[in-house]
């Protein structure tokens, strides 16, 4: 879904950047971040809580036994935690491309890859497959921070609005956690045998 959103938002951002309509550019960028939060954060919380059931439903057959479900669920837990950051980078990249800036996303991408490799190397020993997944989450977070910081450089982006959209994401996180608490205490009743 987020890839579709970023595909749709790029022409809008490009048109706004070329015409110098930075107010509309900011509005579209903030809208993209908010929609990303609205979709990815509840999906993250739900997947965190239902990861064992999801993995078992999709993969548990043949040689993929309970231990395989446990190991895959463990890695999924760390990987899905970075969904919002992965999704936000897919929205932030077009913001740079629309301004004909390919250097900033490239720098963020290179740093992100380096962070991913180093974190995976450091975490794989103690966390096994979960460490590799967590390294991806860490690198997505670092990439998001770098991209947001680099947005400030041009002076055309309303950083207050962008940062406020991240507060909007925090609100969605709190709401999702409240819903998640209910799911946590009722999932055995609802989904149990």
Which role does the model predict for each range below?
Residues 1-193:
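Membrane-embedded alpha-helical bundles of multi-pass transporters/translocases
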């Amino acid at each position: 879904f987020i890839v579709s959103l970023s595909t749709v938002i790029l022409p809008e951002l490009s048109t706004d950047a070329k015409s110098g309509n930075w107010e509309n550019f900011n509005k579209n960028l903030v809208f993209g971040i908010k929609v990303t939060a609205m979709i990815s954060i509840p999906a993250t919380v739900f997947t965190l809580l239902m990861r064992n059931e999801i993995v078992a439903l999709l993969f548990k057959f043949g040689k993929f036994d309970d231990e395989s479900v446990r190991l895959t669920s463990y890695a999924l837990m760390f990987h899905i935690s970075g969904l919002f950051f992965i999704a936000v980078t897919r929205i932030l990249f077009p913001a740079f491309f629309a301004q004909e800036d390919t250097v900033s996303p490239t720098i963020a991408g290179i740093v992100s890859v380096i962070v991913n490799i180093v974190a995976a190397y450091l975490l794989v020993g103690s966390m096994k497959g979960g460490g590799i997944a967590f390294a991806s989450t860490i690198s997505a977070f670092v990439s998001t921070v770098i991209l947001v910081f680099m947005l400030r450089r041009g002076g055309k982006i309303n950083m207050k609005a962008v940062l406020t959209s991240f507060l909007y994401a925090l609100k969605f996180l709190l709401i999702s956690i409240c819903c998640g608490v209910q799911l946590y205490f009722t999932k055995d009743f609802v989904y149990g045998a």
